[in-house]
Design a protein with these regions (language model features):
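Right-hand nucleic-acid polymerase module
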Residues: 1-218, 228-416
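Cys/His-coordinated zinc-finger cores
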Residues: 224
Length: 416
């Protein structure tokens, strides 16, 4: 294909600086090519072979905020592919859905985001840093919608954290099993829980499962939003917290776990404490981004472990990440009490993780399409994230073209 030194591409009018049409009919995408003379230079030409004028649009040179995080996620994904052999993450943002077609590069100008079409996405919230971020962002909006809906009716939302004792030698799979049993008893299984929810008028809840790692090994725990139909003032939740601890302690011991301490086993935030917490982090953020965000020095999230492996190459860290992944793979991260999702979202059904990552933006437009061999060069050089950033930074095509040229040179498909 490269014997004639041309690289077939497809580009949208908007991507080339051409004014958008006002017609309701979709505008046909004009053809253009990226051409090289073999010296390492690449430039776009129109369908007649004339040099394509690239119009500079200052509004399309976007702010850098968030771009570095995107780069970092794709770099981490490259490491995950090496650690989790045989898992779906190996195909994520790497292989194409239709093996006979290239990869489209899409851009949503209003959201300042670029994405790919015809690319596999693993939807693995536990092991893929790229898909986990996409899923978490969507779940965050769902949780915020529920909180806003409830507060608009005069209710309050409290944050409950449930933990159990654990040690560095604890069998993580058994701990997960016993913790899940205790959680089920607390919310569904014992008369004391039913009385507790009735006494304190807890009408709905959203729970999130999270895990960190520290000196005492893996630390799985739950964050739960409790929806009550009244205002919760300063100190007024203390009685509720005491009642909850008594029930939680009983649920743990009956599930084969050690008795949790009153200081560490259960924590309830309400009133000013909760308000300050929400102002700093956002409850919806805490509920959905637990293993994506960076933890404290003494308490690392799974992706902190992955970052450490990326920086040090220490196989002990890779082994630790694998242990975490295979212990919690398939665990549901977010659970809603019956009926809450439909009530807060006006009847909309909850999307699966796969539906979230596969949901392409309806208003995004294709800037250009990557030939199969070009995509192979980009993925071989691990530049999938870099290309999305280049497009988001500059839709005039200068940065994306230069990045593509570099990938082809480094892959031995062009001469420098």
């Amino acid at each position: 294909m490269y014997g004639n030194n041309d690289i077939s591409q497809i580009g949208s009018a908007q991507g080339r600086g051409v004014g958008a049409t006002t017609s309701d009919e979709p505008m046909a995408l004009p053809q253009y090519k990226l051409v090289t003379n073999g010296s390492g230079k690449v430039w776009p030409v129109d369908e007649n072979g004339g040099r394509l004028v690239i119009y500079t649009d200052n509004s399309s040179i976007l702010v850098q905020q968030g771009f570095q995080r995107l780069r970092d996620r794709f770099k981490l994904l490259n490491k995950v592919r090496k650690i989790l052999k045989g898992e779906r993450t190996q195909h994520c943002f790497f292989n194409r859905v239709d093996r006979n077609d290239g990869v489209g590069v899409m851009f949503n100008k209003s959201r300042n985001k670029a994405n790919y079409s015809n690319i596999m996405r693993c939807a693995n919230a536990w092991g893929c840093p790229v898909c986990a971020a996409i899923i978490s962002e969507h779940r965050k909006n769902e949780v915020k919608e529920a909180m806003d809906w409830w507060k608009a009716q005069g209710g309050s939302v409290l944050l409950l954290t449930l933990t159990v004792p654990h040690y560095s030698h604890t069998d993580i799979k058994q701990l997960k099993k016993d913790l899940k049993k205790a959680y089920s008893k607390f919310f569904k299984g014992v008369r004391a829980s039913q009385n507790l929810f009735s006494k304190w008028m807890i009408e709905h809840y959203i729970s999130c499962f999270e895990i960190t790692h520290g000196e005492n090994g893996f630390h799985p725990h739950y964050h739960i939003l409790l929806f009550v139909p009244y205002a919760v003032g300063i100190g007024s939740h203390i009685g509720m917290e005491q009642d909850m601890y008594a029930v939680w302690k009983d649920c743990c011991t009956k599930s084969g776990l050690d008795e949790p301490s009153e200081k560490h086993g259960l924590h309830l935030q309400a009133g000013n404490d909760a308000a300050n917490y929400v102002a700093k982090w956002g409850l919806e953020h805490e509920m959905t981004k637990g293993h994506v965000k960076k933890g404290k020095k003494e308490s690392r999230t799974p992706f902190d472990i992955l970052r450490s492996y990326q920086e040090s190459g220490d196989e002990t860290e890779a082994k630790l990440f694998r242990l975490y992944y295979f212990a919690f793979k398939g665990q549901r991260q977010l659970n809603w009490s019956k009926g809450l999702k439909k009530l807060s979202s006006k009847g909309q059904e909850e999307k699966t993780d796969q539906e979230i990552v596969d949901d392409t933006d309806n208003v995004a437009e294709m800037l250009f399409k990557l030939d199969i061999e070009i995509w192979h060069a980009i993925r071989q050089q691990g530049k999938q994230g870099e290309l999305l950033v280049a497009v988001a930074e500059d839709q005039t095509l200068k940065k994306p073209i230069e990045l593509i040229r570099q990938c082809l040179v480094e892959n031995g498909q062009l001469r420098e």
